[in-house]
Amino acid sequence: MDDMKRKIVRTAGIIMSFFGTAVISVFAYRKISRELYLRRLLKENINFEIPQLNIKVPVLEGTDSKALQVSAGHFEGTGSLGHGNYCIAGHNSTIYAEIFNDLDLIRIGDEMYLFDTDKNRTQYTYVVTEYKIVDPHSVEVLNDYGDNRLTVISCTDDGAYRQVVVGILQEKS
């Protein structure tokens, strides 16, 4: 009987090892696929960076769920690069490791960058002038204020409010 128990335990161990390896392989494949997709998006689209927070993401046109799954999204109808109020949004969730998780750590005076898709990858440097928490229905943050600014919007971690970071254009190079 002891020999039979050993065979069962050994067989169970082999089966568990096989399934464990398969599960890990699936997750590794998904992570690698997502990383490769993200690299392609960074190469083909406008890029947004906040070096102090280790944020570097592509900016896709529109804020639909498909765009926001992998990137920040530009609110259609708001400014263009270096002109007006260029507004972008991205997800925040410490549980799911989303792109704007650390947005609440931004400080006045920090720099944010947008990189164009042109041949020279023109850099737009914005200096943070404001961080605030607003009601989800506060759409006035999307308004044109007559200056050249970047507005970054994301949920608070609990999703009840919106974090808003405003930076004023300092340089185009």
Kindly label every feature range from the protein language model.
Residues 1-3:
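Juxtamembrane low-complexity tails/linkers enriched in Ser/Thr-Pro and polybasic
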Residues 5-173:
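Solvent-exposed, non-transmembrane regions of membrane-associated and secreted proteins
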